[in-house]
Amino acid sequence: MLIVGGNTSGTEFSDQGTILTPEIWNPTTRAWRSVADLSVPRNYHSVALLMTDGRVWSGGGGLCNCAADHPDHQVYSPPYLFNADGTLATRPVIAAAPDVVTFGRTVNVQATAGAAKV
């Protein structure tokens, strides 16, 4: 889980108290880890979306026709997408999964090597 954006002041249409540092939840260690700061505040009316390649797109904020408007976006690339030398890491691929799932049922998904516990 990635938490991105927000502020501490609750003041609408303002970048006062902006939280620039995203955090990632590690379910194994049950701890949050801070990652690299955002370059632009993401406050009121902002959005973050998980992209199909594992990166996170975040954009917007403001909508007040003032300095707190941020009609732009940025893309966060989680560290696990890369090897230590900066090259792209091999990503697991879903090899088999059901076409339909039912609420309350267990879903089994087969993936190529490298998939961790989900």
Segment roles from a protein language model:
Residues 1-118:
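Kelch-like beta-propeller repeat domains
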